[in-house]
Amino acid sequence: MVLGKDGLLIEGFAAPGLNTEDLAARVPALVSEAESLGRATQQGSLNTAILEHQKGYSIVAALADETLLLVLLRPSADLGGLLFDVRRYRGNIASLI
């Protein structure tokens, strides 16, 4: 899903039963805390956050100043491959928005 840092969904789809607008609305609070942690630890702004849940992963990646990418993965997904692709194509994705 692509969303604004304000939590408004720009484009996205999810598995049946998941509400993309609701998911997008939940991301800004997480990003705000991650940005705060980056400032407090002097590590800079957030590029990518990886959350491991019991039944999968949530990846939040900054695309541009005001846009984010949210990817939901099953536990069996190739996490390393996805992170590589996000880093590699981040600029390309951002240019499409």
What residue spans do the PLM features occupy?
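Acidic, low-complexity cytosolic segments
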Residues: 6-97
